[in-house]
């Protein structure tokens, strides 16, 4: 499949969509390999801009959301502990759910809302203005040019956000429980350590990376699928947000059903 054969009209049907997604991912992997081999130059300014867009610009929002999750978590655990004096069981269960399910999904949704939408809008704008044709004329592969720096930034920032979000969430929740129920920080930390088995850590770290790849591919499908109409830019942004959230939730469900034992 080639973008010139598609005439930048985007995929028609799910088979072409899967083909374009595979083509986009393959072009990025080939590009990364050529960069590592010293046969290609990496666009550092574009990568820095992508880091700013997908990371630093939403760090305050990420932090605020994680603080809110920590307060909610602390309040809910406090309510359970007033009825059942089983802090070990409660904290272990809640910590597992938060680390494995809630935080990766929240990080994915926030990254999709910022970096994913921005990528789709940029690609749709390049199409509408004819700049995508200019890239082809100059011998530049449009997919790797627009996607590769953003995908790498998404992967790095998704990993960093998960680590940061976990620290913030459980620091706030632990402080709440210490102040309201007297659960010692040492006991809280011990329960978290017990919940974080190697398998749990691997799953918690892999999910945001998988979600980042899905977000980038969904954004590319919507950006390329916007066509050459200026009005397609708004549709690309909306489609990316809806498609990315749907892909994240469905993938998470499939992971639970098919992979987790």
Model-derived features: positions:
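Short cytoplasmic-facing helical segments at TM-TM junctions of multi-pass membrane proteins
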Residues: 122-148, 230-233
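Selective transmembrane-helix segments that form parts of the transport pathway or gating/packing helices
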Residues: 55, 59, 63, 102, ...
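Hydrophobic alpha-helical transmembrane segments of multi-pass membrane transport proteins
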Residues: 90-128
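Membrane-interfacial helix-loop-helix connectors in multipass membrane proteins
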Residues: 75-99, 164-209, 213, 217-239, ...
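Hydrophobic alpha-helical transmembrane segments of small proteolipidic membrane proteins, enriched
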Residues: 25-29, 41, 46, 52-74, ...
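Short, membrane-interfacial amphipathic segments enriched in basic
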Residues: 2-47, 222
């Amino acid at each position: 499949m080639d973008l010139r054969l598609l005439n930048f009209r985007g995929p028609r049907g799910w088979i072409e969509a899967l083909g374009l997604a595979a083509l986009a991912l393959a072009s990025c992997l080939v590009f990364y390999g050529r960069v590592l081999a010293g046969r290609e130059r990496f666009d550092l300014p574009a990568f820095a801009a992508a880091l700013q867009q997908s990371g630093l610009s939403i760090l305050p929002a990420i932090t605020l959301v994680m603080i809110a999750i920590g307060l909610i978590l602390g309040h809910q655990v406090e309510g359970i502990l007033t009825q059942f004096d089983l802090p070990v069981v409660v904290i272990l269960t809640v910590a597992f759910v938060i680390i494995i399910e809630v935080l990766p999904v929240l990080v994915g949704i926030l990254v999709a809302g910022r970096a994913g939408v921005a990528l789709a809008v940029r690609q749709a704008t390049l199409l509408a203005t004819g700049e995508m044709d200019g890239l082809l004329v100059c011998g530049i592969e449009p997919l790797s040019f627009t996607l590769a720096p953003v995908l790498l930034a998404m992967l790095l920032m998704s990993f960093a956000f998960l680590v940061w979000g976990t620290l913030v969430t459980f620091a706030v929740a632990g402080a709440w429980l210490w102040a309201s129920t007297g659960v010692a920080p040492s006991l809280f930390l011990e329960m978290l350590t017990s919940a974080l088995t190697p398998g749990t850590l691997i799953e918690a770290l892999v999910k945001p990376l998988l979600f980042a790849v899905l977000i980038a591919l969904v954004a590319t499908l919507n950006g390329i699928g916007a066509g050459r109409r200026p009005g397609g830019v708004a549709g690309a942004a909306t489609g990316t947000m809806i498609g990315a959230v749907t892909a994240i939730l469905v993938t998470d469900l499939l992971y639970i059903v098919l992979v987790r034992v």
